[in-house]
Amino acid sequence: MRAWIIWSTGLLAYIVAVLDRTTLGVSGLDAADRFSAGPSVLSTFVVLQVVVYAGAQVPAGLLLDRYGSRVLIVTGAALMAAGQVTLALTDSLPLALGARAIVGLGDAVTFISVLRLVPHWFPPRRVPLLTQLTGICGQFGQVLSAIPFLAILASAGWATAYVSVTAFGALAMVLAFALVRDTPRGRVRATETLTVRGTLASVKTVWLRPGTRLGFFTHMGTQFSVTVFALMWGVPYLTVAQGLSTHAAGALLTVSVVAAISAGVVLGILTGRLPHRRSWFVLIIIASNVLIWTVVLALPDRAPLWLLVVLVVVISVGGPGSMVGFDFARTFNPSATLGTAQGMVNMGGFLAALLVMQSMGAILDARGGYSFDAFRVAWTVQYVVWAVAVTGILITRGKARRQMRAEQERSLLETFEAS
């Protein structure tokens, strides 16, 4: 029971992180009025969030290995609360951007810290499913931003809505401080201070493990498409290029969340029971993404609604698919450097998403703005990422398997010699 209480408390902190991550997205029009910002400036908030989140992953992983989950979850909640209360009270655009960066920093340390709790508190056979459930349940934060937060925003205004979110974050911080413990044996104690050279050597060692890179390319190839779709270009594509109403586009994003939840449960069970087939599951998910996008983009005109539904469902499976990358990191890294490895894995999809978002924006501008033909060309940027990711998976998978066999043979030899 204690393990479930600790995981649930960490999960609440992650739900708040997703809530904080998505509040600005649902309040975009209000933000435009409050900060006198046009569409390009508003998109800066999204890009800034991704840049800070991705850039902070390796430092967050190093801090996680040094100080443990409890310290980082509490710190992350405090940073996000500080950023949200600043957004609540300011009408200065530069200050709002700075506050958004602080929110992104707090968000960056939270997810991997909650994931780190799972292998410490649960038996190995449950870890894959609980890893999936962590990612899945965290998406309830998006529901909170879309329903109660938006309702408060509409009825009570900007400041009240953002202060309410700040209060929720403060609650998560207090509960994490009171209830979360790093391991059953007590808290993680800080190791000796590392020099800059020592830190870089540690990062290099973790990255050179084939399992870490396998997780990185897994996260890259599965997660970026749905992230780009949900965070920036999905709604404009559905409404302008495909001719759907805003209501219909919102309904498809709801379908995306349901599809991700359903796929996550199934994938968690499968990866737990068939751990040696994890990379095949990942390759199938990437192949399905490539196939459905090829079908949609090959059409000379707008796609029928049923095909767009299939598109959204298929790319949404990439969200839980990316969680397999963290399972690779856990399998091929010792506990002492697991945080660093998970941070590296988490960079993969977000770096790819950032590059695709920026590249698509440049292509859309070059082709005269939002149109069916412009989007049709812009979405093809994804194929470059898929090619890189699949190549990386195939190469690192072979190296990881050889490393595992060598370690098993070494273990057997040591056992034989000891007997």
For each predicted feature, which ranges?
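Juxtamembrane intracellular "pre-TM" segments in multi-pass secondary transporters
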Residues: 183-216, 410-419
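Helix-loop-helix hairpin linking two adjacent transmembrane segments in secondary transporters
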Residues: 134-185
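Helix-breaking motifs and short loop linkers at transmembrane-helix boundaries and internal kinks
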Residues: 36, 68, 89-94, 123, ...
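Cytoplasmic helix-loop-helix junction between adjacent transmembrane helices
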Residues: 99-138
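Extracytoplasmic gate region of multi-pass secondary transporters
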Residues: 24-25, 210-264, 357-361
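Conserved MFS/SLC helix-loop-helix module at the cytosolic interface between two early adjacent transmembrane helices
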Residues: 55-94
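Cytoplasmic membrane-interface "Motif A"-like loop-to-helix N-cap segments
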Residues: 66-76, 272-287
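Helix-to-loop junctions at the C-terminal end of transmembrane segments
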Residues: 56-68, 263-277
